């Protein structure tokens, strides 16, 4: 089974929770070993720990890209194949192409690619996508200052509202 990372954005917390329930159902039934993988804490808006997730969340969800796309779309979200420029967990590395049977409008290129224009010039098929750039940070200390931003007055503009 190929593994790819997909970034998803949602118009509301409720929409994100709706999609998360579907993804959670597809995770393997493996208990987290905090001494190996660390704690998986639930936090409130004030960064207080409110509980811990017992199931290991680092595992791959057993679902196809198409299935996830349908989940995201039904929740009103945006589906973005992540770090398509990287050698791991990239749809381009795993499949060699971006499937055309999924209505993908956006892709994400990681901070690892310094010359995005050259990367895109070598791959004509990517020109048609909206490009997002992110730090792909998994830890707070890896987050970087924003190099780009979305010029919108309300989040609903991002979701066609």
Regions found by a protein language model. Give the residues of each.
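Short, basic/glycine-rich phosphate-binding loops at helix/coil junctions
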Residues: 37-51
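His/acidic metal-ligating clusters that form di-metal
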Residues: 64-69
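Charged catalytic cores and adjacent phosphate/nucleic-acid-binding surfaces used
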Residues: 1-27, 39, 56-57, 70, ...
């Amino acid at each position: 089974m190929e593994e790819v990372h997909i970034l998803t954005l949602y118009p509301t917390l409720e929409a994100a929770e709706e999609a998360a329930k579907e993804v959670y159902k597809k995770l393997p039934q493996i208990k987290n070993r905090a001494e190996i993988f660390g704690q998986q804490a639930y936090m409130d808006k004030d960064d207080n720990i409110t509980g811990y997730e017992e199931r290991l969340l680092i595992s791959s969800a057993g679902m196809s890209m198409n299935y996830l796309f349908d989940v995201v779309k039904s929740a009103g979200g945006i589906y973005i194949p992540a770090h398509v420029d990287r050698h791991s967990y990239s749809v381009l590395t795993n499949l060699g192409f971006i499937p055309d049977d999924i209505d993908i409008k956006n892709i994400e290129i990681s901070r690892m690619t310094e010359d995005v224009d050259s990367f895109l010039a070598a791959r004509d098929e990517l020109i048609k996508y909206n490009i997002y750039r992110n730090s792909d940070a998994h830890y707070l200390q890896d987050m970087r200052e924003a190099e780009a931003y979305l010029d919108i007055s309300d989040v609903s503009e991002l979701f066609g509202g």
